[in-house]
Structure formats: structure tokens, C-alpha cells
């Protein structure tokens, strides 16, 4: 039974008080509580409580560092707030054990572990090493305080770690709740905004991104436009408020933007998923996917530095649609399905969709388009208020409904000026859903106002590997008037219908055409050719090309139709296997004469080298030959018109034939051209090798003067009628 003390004044000599106080002395000494209660019901501090107060006082006054002393040198600790450096770990330690028996003596060359241990009631670390260890732990980030919405000075941890999430604003993902207004404050604040928690976030409004915003849409996150909202999901502040250009905006991550187009009714700019205009530096991508946009997934305009890497589409119209001015663009890895063009560059547009400003597309580098399905992979078109300058498009794969790359005119886009364009590494198959289309099409389609509808200074097409067996690989057309000043096609497909075609008379011109480096198997079709020309080609250069034709009924190196024009052609290292003719002019006379220069040319089989219909052709040959033929068809044939030969052709058969008043002759000089001289129109001073043994001059080297052919070995002569 507990002893009941008296209320006698102090000092009391009552045995009851004596016994009670004995218990209180034990409580004072041994209790871990901070206080005990005396017989008058008053509280006093225990030894533990006194220690606590002393510790708080020492903390308030700070620690006393024993300068020059360490565990290595040894030291004497006289007070609880004195600390000693352990050089082994760079940590300061204080002694929390008893000082009842005097100071704590630390021998030289000791450690905290060897002089009492590290634990409460012994040595404990009080320096920054403990803090560093705690912060370095996986849970260390939880030790750093952060206030959402607070502005931290640059260079501080708070500044570096600051970002915002919907959850910080009380917003959770939901497939039913519309939370657009709930995040207005978050987007107004800008900075780093992170949709990290997977789920659907439904907005009924456009979220406006301020300058400096870095928006992260994480994996499993879908930002969806509510039914009937009829607005873009994202705009930037400059565009939304017609204000100064935004410095930097980023939209990144592998989440999804769902325009929900099946449940929107608007047309025009409201049908875009995102509109971003007036930005110095814009970065979009990271695997982000746009679905269900009724018009462009991304409409981007007036950007100085555009970076678009890793865009994914499943949408009804264009994927990434760019309008000028855009001064530097780095575009990589676009993929998916687009109802129209996956990547479009338009200077101007239809009125409902046009936010462009006068200016150029310059320094544009696009690579890696993977078309699961696209109407076209890339489209380039303009209205004359700017130019396309220094463009490279590379690496297009998959399937396109129509052409892979298209440069063309339209009702509102009547003048396209391209300064420098490179298109390379094209593997996508055009015309995948039906009618065959060219891999690359340049076509003004009859739209224009003045001058040229399409004018291209330099076009380089390299590594064109698209397999197309029913249409020209590169198709040049238009009835208004278009020109390509310099076109190079380097690296040709293995199989083809035709490589390049100029498909309209009088309205199309190519100043300089070069086609090179390929070993092609052509379809057995009358229009199969390396070049098909109905218009004007000033210089036609074909180099290092092997042409494999199925038969001698079809196929040609150059198919020249009616009144087309070719001023000069240079063919170097060209191999023709079978085929109908190398140079094949049909229908009616060409406009003007042509120089055809053949170097290291081989015609293998019964196909002809050149035939004209009512036209004038000069053929200069160097190291040329015709092999594996029977002479059933002559190498050269003039159906009306005239062919002038010079140089060297190795063959064992007569090389010339004519009808309909056609003329074949040589230039003056000695030529290694085997032929029947009775078929060769005489030109004074010309020398060839006669193969017609029935002529009075006999076979062999002959020279003509005033229509008299003289055998240079026998002296025998033959007088020609032509």
C-alpha cells in the first residue's frame, strides 16, 4: 500500500514523510521522465530532465570545438558541449555519457568506437557528415522542405527541385470528372509542370502554356478534351494573347493527348489539337502521342528553334504541320497513322487554317518518319510569301496512300520556291491502298498566278529505294508552268517502272538532270525507262547505271515523246541489257536538235542504241560496244529526221538503218563505226568500216569524197547515191 505523506511544513520529521521522500529520491535519480511530484503536489525536474534542459541550453549556445585536438592527438572533454574531430570520417563527436566521475579522457590514436562506442549515452556525431549521409540515403529527398508556389532564388535547391503536379492542386485523374478549371492556376504559374500519376485528365478548355513552361506528360497519362469543347488542348501564351514571343516552351513525355475529335463539331483553328506560335525555342516529343485530332495534331508557326523528337500519331489529318517563319528545325522519329500528311510545310494555307506570316523555312533537318499509314509522308507547298531554304528530309519508311514526298500547288498555294532540298533514304512504299503513285511528286496541278508555280533551284534525291512497279519513281508534272534548275537522283531502286518523268509538254523544264548509280530491273512496259520526257531537259546526264529489260519489245534508257526538247545528253558507264532502244524518240519531231554523248556505253542484246522520228540527233561515242546481238536490229535507226554519228562503236554488224526519208551520216574524220555505206549519207572526208561486201569498194576501211567511197587498202571505189 502506497505511503501517504503528511502536509507538515518543511522540514518534517514524520516517519511517513521520510518513507515517501525515499521513494522520490529514487524517482529523481533513476526515472527517465523529466519531472517528479513532491508531497505538496509540486513538480520538480529529475536528473534526466536536468540533462535535457542542459542539452537545450548547450544547443542554444552551440558546440565548443577543441581546436587542435582530435581523436588522433587525444583530448580531455570537460563539458557536454565540447566536440572532438575524428579525422578518419571528418565528423565531430560529442560525449553524451556521464561526467559524474570527472572529465572524459580520450587517449591518443583512438576512435569513437574504441573509447566508449557510438550510441546514445556514449559518442554521437554532431557534424555535417551525419547530415550528408542522411541526405545521400534513398529517403534523403524527404528531408528537404519544399513549398508549392513559392519562388526560390536561382541556384538554390528549392529552385532546382520546384515543379507542380495536378495532385498538388487537389486534382486526381478521372474518366468522368472535368477538371479544366482546377488546373488554371497551375498553368498560370508555369515552370515545370508534371502529369506523373497515370490516368485520364479531362479538360473543357485550352490550357495556355506560358514562357518557360516545361510540361511533362508521363507514361499512362491521357489528357483528353471534353465532349463539345471545340478548342485546342494547348496554346502558348504569345499566340493566345497576341503578345511578345515566348522564350521557351517544352511539351515532353510518353503520354497521350486525346483531342476526342469524334465528339467535337468545330472546323477551322478550333479543330487543331495544339497550336504553338511565336516561340524562340520550342521542344516537343519524347514519345508523346496525339489521337483523334480532326485537323492538325500540332500546328507550329513562327519558331526560331524547333526541336521535335519522338512524335506519335493516330489522327485524322496532318501530324506535324509547320507554317513560317521557322528558322532552324531539328525533327526526328515521327511515327503512326495520319489521315493526311505526317509532316507538312506550308507557306500559307487554306483560310480556315492559316496562321502563317511572311518568311522562310530555313535550315530544316527532318529524319526518321515511320508511316504505319499516311496520305503522304511529307508535303511542301507555298503561296509565294517565303522560300524553302536549306532543307533535308531523310529516312522515310512504311506505307503511304499516295506519294511519299510531295511538292505541289493548290488553290490557295500557287507559288512554291525551293532553294535547296535534299531527299534521301526513301524506303516507304507509295500508293499502298490502290492506285500507284510516285515516290516523289513535283506537280503544280495547274495552279499558279505568274512566273513559275513551282521553282526549285537545287534538288538532290539520294538512295531512292522505294519499290514502285506501276509509276515513275520521281514524277514531275503541271500544266501552269514549273522548273527544276538542278536535279540529281543518286542511288536508284533495284526494280522500277521508270525513274524520272517530265510529264507535260511546253510547261515543264529541267535545266540540268543527273541520274546515277543503280542496277535496275525494269517492268516489261512500253513506258519503262530511266527518263521519260514530254517537256524540256537542257542537260540530261546518266552515269553508272545498269538497265535490265525483260525483252526487246519494251524499255528504253530515255523515252522522248513528240515535241519535247533535250539539248544535250551525256551517258557515262551505262549498260543496256535488251530493251527496245536506248535513245527512243517517238510520235513526232522533237523541238530542236540533240547532242548525245556516249562514254563506256554497252548495248547487250538485240535492242537499239538510238532511234529518232523526224528529229535531229548527233551521237558521239567513246569506247562503246554492242554485244550478244545477231544484227536483226541496227544499232541506229532514223524514221525520218537525221542522225549524225562520230567516234567508236565495237560491233560485228551493220549499225544503221532508215526509212521515211531518214538520214544517217557521220562527221568528217576517221570513225570506228561498222556499217553498210550504201545506207550512210556521204559527208566529204568521212571514214568508216564498210561491212557490205556486195559493194564495188569491197569490205574494209573506206573514205568518201564527193559520194565516192574508196577502200583505203585495195583502192576499189563505190559511188553512192546519197
Residue ranges and their predicted role:
Residues 215-218, 246-253, 282-286, 305-310, ...:
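All-beta strand scaffolds that present successive hydrophobic residues in beta-strands
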Residues 1-195, 215:
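Non-transmembrane elongated oligomeric "stalk/shaft" segments that connect baseplates/barrels to distal
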Residues 110-118, 180-188, 200-216, 224-252, ...:
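Extracellular beta-strand-rich solenoid/capping regions of secreted or surface-exposed proteins
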Residues 124, 194, 202, 208, ...:
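Extracellular beta-strand solenoid repeats
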Residues 204-205, 225-231, 260-265, 272, ...:
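Short glycine/acidic-rich loop motifs that flank beta-strands on beta-rich extracellular proteins
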Residues 1-9, 685, 695-700, 706-722:
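Viral virion structural and adsorption modules
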Residues 85, 115, 124-127, 224, ...:
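Beta-strand-rich, repetitive solenoid scaffolds
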Residues 413-499, 503-512, 523:
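Gly/Ser/Thr/Ala-enriched C-terminal appendages of enzymes
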Amino acid at each position: 500500500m502506497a505511503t501517504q505523506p503528511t502536509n507538515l511544513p518543511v522540514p518534517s520529521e514524520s516517519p511517513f514523510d521520510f518513507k515517501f521522500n525515499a521513494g522520490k529520491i529514487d524517482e529523481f535519480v533513476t526515472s527517465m521522465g523529466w519531472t517528479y511530484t513532491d508531497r505538496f503536489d509540486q513538480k520538480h525536474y529529475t536528473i534526466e530532465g536536468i540533462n535535457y534542459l542542459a542539452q537545450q541550453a548547450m544547443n542554444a549556445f552551440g558546440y565548443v570545438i577543441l581546436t587542435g585536438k582530435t581523436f588522433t592527438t587525444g583530448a580531455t572533454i570537460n563539458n557536454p558541449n565540447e566536440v572532438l574531430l575524428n579525422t578518419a570520417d571528418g565528423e565531430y563527436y560529442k560525449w553524451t555519457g556521464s561526467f559524474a566521475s570527472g572529465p572524459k579522457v580520450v587517449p591518443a590514436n583512438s576512435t569513437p568506437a574504441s573509447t566508449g562506442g557510438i550510441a546514445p549515452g556514449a559518442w554521437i556525431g554532431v557534424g555535417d557528415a551525419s547530415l550528408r549521409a542522411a541526405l545521400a540515403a534513398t529517403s534523403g529527398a524527404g528531408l528537404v522542405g519544399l513549398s508549392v508556389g513559392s519562388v526560390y532564388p536561382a541556384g538554390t535547391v528549392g529552385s532546382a527541385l520546384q515543379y507542380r503536379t495536378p495532385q498538388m492542386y487537389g486534382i486526381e485523374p478521372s474518366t468522368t470528372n472535368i477538371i479544366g478549371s482546377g488546373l488554371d492556376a497551375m498553368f498560370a504559374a508555369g515552370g515545370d509542370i508534371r502529369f506523373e500519376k497515370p490516368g485520364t485528365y479531362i479538360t473543357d478548355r485550352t490550357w495556355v502554356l506560358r514562357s518557360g513552361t516545361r510540361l511533362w506528360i508521363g507514361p499512362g497519362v491521357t489528357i483528353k478534351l471534353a465532349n463539345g469543347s471545340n478548342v485546342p488542348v494547348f496554346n502558348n501564351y504569345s499566340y493566345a494573347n497576341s503578345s511578345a514571343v515566348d522564350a521557351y516552351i517544352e511539351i515532353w513525355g510518353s503520354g497521350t493527348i486525346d483531342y476526342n475529335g469524334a465528339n467535337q463539331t468545330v472546323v477551322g483553328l478550333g479543330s487543331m489539337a495544339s497550336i504553338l506560335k511565336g516561340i524562340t525555342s520550342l521542344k516537343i516529343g519524347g514519345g508523346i502521342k496525339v489521337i483523334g485530332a480532326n485537323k492538325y495534331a500540332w500546328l507550329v508557326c513562327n519558331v526560331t528553334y524547333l526541336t521535335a523528337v519522338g512524335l506519335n500519331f493516330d489522327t485524322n489529318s496532318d501530324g506535324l504541320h509547320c507554317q513560317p517563319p521557322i528558322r532552324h528545325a531539328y525533327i526526328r522519329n515521327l511515327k503512326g497513322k495520319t489521315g493526311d500528311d505526317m509532316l507538312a510545310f506550308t507557306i500559307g494555307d487554306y483560310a480556315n487554317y492559316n496562321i502563317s506570316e511572311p518568311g522562310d523555312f530555313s535550315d530544316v533537318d527532318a529524319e526518321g518518319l515511320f508511316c504505319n499509314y499516311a496520305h503522304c509522308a511529307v508535303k511542301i507547298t507555298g503561296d509565294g510569301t517565303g522560300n524553302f531554304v536549306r532543307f533535308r528530309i531523310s529516312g522515310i519508311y512504311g506505307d503511304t496512300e499516295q506519294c511519299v514526298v510531295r511538292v505541289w500547288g493548290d488553290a490557295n498555294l500557287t507559288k512554291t520556291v525551293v532553294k535547296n532540298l535534299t531527299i534521301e533514304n526513301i524506303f516507304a512504299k507509295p500508293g499502298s491502298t490502290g492506285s500507284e503513285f510516285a515516290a516523289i511528286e513535283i506537280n503544280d496541278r495547274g495552279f499558279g498566278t505568274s512566273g513559275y508555280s513551282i521553282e526549285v533551284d537545287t534538288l538532290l534525291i539520294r538512295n531512292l529505294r522505294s519499290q514502285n512497279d506501276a509509276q515513275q519513281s520521281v514524277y514531275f508534272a503541271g500544266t501552269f508552268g514549273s522548273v527544276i534548275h538542278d536535279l540529281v537522283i543518286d542511288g536508284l531502286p533495284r526494280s522500277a517502272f521508270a525513274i524520272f518523268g517530265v510529264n507535260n509538254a511546253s510547261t515543264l523544264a529541267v535545266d540540268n538532270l543527273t541520274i546515277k548509280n543503280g542496277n535496275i530491273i525494269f517492268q516489261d512496259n512500253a513506258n519503262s525507262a530511266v527518263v521519260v520526257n514530254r517537256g524540256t531537259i537542257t542537260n540530261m546526264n546518266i552515269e553508272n547505271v545498269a538497265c535490265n529489260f525483260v525483252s526487246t519489245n519494251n524499255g528504253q534508257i530515255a523515252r522522248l515523246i513528240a515535241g519535247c526538247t533535250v539539248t544535250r545528253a551525256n551517258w557515262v558507264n551505262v549498260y543496256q541489257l535488251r530493251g527496245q532502244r536506248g535513245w527512243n524518240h517517238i510520235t513526232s519531231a522533237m523541238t530542236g536538235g540533240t547532242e548525245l554523248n556516249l562514254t563506256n556505253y554497252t548495248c547487250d542484246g538485240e535492242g537499239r542504241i538510238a532511234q529518232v522520228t523526224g528529229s535531229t540527233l548527233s551521237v558521239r561515242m567513246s569506247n562503246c560496244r554492242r554485244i550478244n546481238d545477231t544484227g536483226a536490229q541496227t544499232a541506229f535507226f532514223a524514221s525520218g529526221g537525221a542522225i549524225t554519228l562520230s567516234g567508236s562503236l565495237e560491233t560485228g554488224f551493220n549499225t544503221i538503218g532508215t526509212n521515211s526519208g531518214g538520214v544517217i551520216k557521220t562527221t568528217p574524220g576517221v570513225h570506228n563505226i561498222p556499217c553498210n555505206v550504201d545506207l550512210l549519207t556521204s559527208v566529204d572526208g568521212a571514214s568508216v568500216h564498210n561491212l557490205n561486201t556486195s559493194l564495188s569498194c569491197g569490205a574494209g576501211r573506206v573514205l568518201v569524197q564527193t559520194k565516192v567511197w574508196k577502200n583505203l587498202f585495195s583502192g576499189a571505189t563505190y559511188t553512192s547515191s546519197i
